């Protein structure tokens, strides 16, 4: 593991394996960064959050709570992943997007713009949630489905 630049690891946080933390990134609390994961830029990983595998958290992104980001997932821009949210596979969460609650974003799904995915919602396969769209409750958005604009999906399947 490497921690360099102005990066900081504090509290009971731990960085190990081939993980990299650099730039002005902050890893603290009980957070773990491991495997080949990278945390860089001004990103923060804190609370009990896990970032592992080949995941990349960068820019001004924040991953917190009991959330985890793994696989080849990327969280960047001003994106927030918090509570118990999970981002994995080749998923991307970026822009000002938020993923929270017990929500999951996986496979090659993308959540971006000012979109919000929360509750027990799942966004997976090649699905996209963008603009100011909200996906929540027990909603599942999958396949090549796109939810955008000011749309709200609070239950059921879209795929």
Where in this protein do the model-derived segments appear?
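Long terminal segments
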Residues: 147-159
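Thr-biased low-complexity repeat/linker tracts and other Thr-enriched repetitive architectures
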Residues: 1-150
